Amino acid sequence: MKRIALFLATNLAVMIVFSIVLNIVYAVTGIQQGSLSGLLVMAVLFGFGGSLISLMMSKSMALRSVGGEVIEQPRNETEHWLLETVSRQAQQVGIGMPTVAIYDSPDMNAFATGAKRDDSLVAVSTGLLHSMTRDEAEAVLAHEVSHIANGDMITMTLMQGVVNTFVIFLSRMIANAVSGFTSSDEEGEGEGGSFMTYFIVSTVLELAFGFLASFLTMWFSRHREFHADAGAAQLVGKQKMIAALERLRMGQESQLEGSMMAFGINGKKSLTELLMSHPPLEKRIDALRQM
């Protein structure tokens, strides 16, 4: 789950920077006023650019954000068990051995991230290692390995790129129309006023459309959680996965943020399930029992 939260946060930051750059390009070239095709090309480049940069940076940013320590050589029995378990599961699903890290946090969580199936990261909290049995922790690791095997981060990147492109294109197309309408009605405003109108309208619309698009992003995240749970059940047995989710119900809410949250084992609560990156634990447990 930590991995989705970080991905979305990074993507948002990149999108804000790209939005400012796009507005500067508009002010200098005026390409958006006369060419919808030019706007579409820029929307695709900048929309997918933000997602791809987020994906490429996800592994290093995730480690830095949680202060994770990569296990190079196991120093104790727990670290040895972690490496052996992840290695075995990675071989079972046919992916390269992920980098394994531990980060200090009281909440029971873990996350996976990385741009490629054969160059990924699995990080586990100290809270999870201290609070879960080995069987439960094994199920959590299987859940994260399943995320990697399913290529969820790649799919999320492609989907986010499409969403970003739509948000950029539609917000600027509407902003063009509004700025053109207001500048013709207020001739004394001049080019500076027209650009300010465009900048304000496009920024507000990007934020609004981006918020609405998050419903789609969160739906995808919830959908993939069920698949990762099912993948873990195939690797270690559904009873272990159910036991791990039952244990999570006793713990505190996840402290993971950004893209990391979406690909962690547990998510944050929200006023509405539509804005949750993870389905309620009860629904996940019921789905496993029905397998």
Swiss-Prot record:
Cofactor: binding details: Binds 1 zinc ion per subunit.
Cofactor needs: Zn(2+)
Main location, first listed in the record: membrane
Enzyme class: hydrolase
EC assignment: 3.4.24.-
InterPro entries associated with the record: HtpX_protease, Pept_M48_protease_HtpX, Peptidase_M48
Amino-acid positions noted as binding Zn(2+) in the UniProt annotation, renumbered to this chain: H143, H147, E225
Keywords for this protein: Cell inner membrane, Cell membrane, Hydrolase, Membrane, Metal-binding, Metalloprotease, Protease, Transmembrane, Transmembrane helix, Zinc
Transmembrane segments: 4-24, 36-56, 151-171, 199-219
Keyword Phosphoprotein belongs to the record: no
BP GO terms, sorted: proteolysis
Location(s) in or outside the cell: Cell inner membrane
Family: Belongs to the peptidase M48B family.
Annotated protein name in UniProt: Protease HtpX
